[in-house]
Amino acid sequence: MDNNIRQLIGANQVAEILGISSSYAYKIIEELNQELEKAGYLTIRGKVDSLYLERRYFPTPDKIYTVNN
């Protein structure tokens, strides 16, 4: 995933990025979209913002450090 490009991605891309099945990817997309809707954002069913997915599933090294210490 390119860190500088924001795009909406579907279940097949989410599945590939996370190494999961596409059916499980749909569940993850639904959960992430519910979080975004709760925060007041509009969402598209079956798509999720790539940067939001990255932020939720791939923490930065400084966040990993603070959790481990």
Predicted feature locations:
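Short hydrophobic "helix-edge" motifs at membrane interfaces and signal-peptide entry regions
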Residues: M1-D2, G40
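Polyanion-binding surface elements
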Residues: D2-Y24
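Major-groove DNA-recognition helix of helix-turn-helix-type DNA-binding domains
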Residues: I20-Y65
